[in-house]
UniProtKB/Swiss-Prot annotation:
Substrate binds at residues 75, 81, 88, 102-103, 112. Its EC number is 4.2.1.10. It comes from the Bacteria. It is an enzyme of class 4 (lyase). This is 3-dehydroquinate dehydratase. Belongs to the type-II 3-dehydroquinase family. Catalyzes a trans-dehydration via an enolate intermediate. The record marks 21 as: Transition state stabilizer.
Length: 151
């Protein structure tokens, strides 16, 4: 890749409670631990990883609008099932993205089965815990390298 590619990692509401909140569904890793591991991996791959977590929808939208990233990894959390505005923000910037969920949303309550993002995502990873973020990052880096090789 010529220059350092950027990936924006977006984490939605309540993910700041990882490690304490319902560990049976979400695991014992904290968000800080997950982000640190991803930053280490991205740095070793020559990619810049920017991260935002917010419980406020408008802050996530503003970060997406302002990003210069070439790829987005997003765990919209509860906004998955409710936020047309967040969906529109991602579609508005035309940046490819992967949707990640720690738990298997399809094995949970029926209201969690619908996503406003999945139909537009490059891929969806759910139910693999914190490792799902690693898979998303590896895929994003691979796609960015392939895109760079084409140019």
């Amino acid at each position: 890749m010529g220059g350092k590619a950027k990936i924006l990692l977006v984490n939605g509401p309540n993910l700041n409670l990882l490690g304490r909140r319902e560990p049976g569904h979400y695991g014992h890793h904290t968000l800080d631990q997950i982000v640190k591991e991803l930053q280490d991996e991205s740095t070793s791959s020559g990619v810049v990883l920017e991260h935002i977590q917010s419980n406020a929808e408008h802050e996530l939208i503003d970060a997406i609008h302002a990003t210069e990233a070439e790829f987005i990894i997003i765990n919209p959390a509860a906004f998955t099932h409710t936020s047309v505005a967040l969906r529109d923000a991602i579609l508005g910037v035309s940046i490819p993205f992967i949707e990640v969920h720690l738990s298997n949303v399809h094995a949970r309550e029926p209201f969690r089965h619908h996503s406003y993002f999945s139909d537009k995502a490059v891929g969806v990873i759910c139910g693999l815990g914190a490792q799902g973020y690693q898979f998303a990052l590896q895929s994003a880096i691979s796609r960015l390298k392939a895109k760079s090789a084409e140019h």
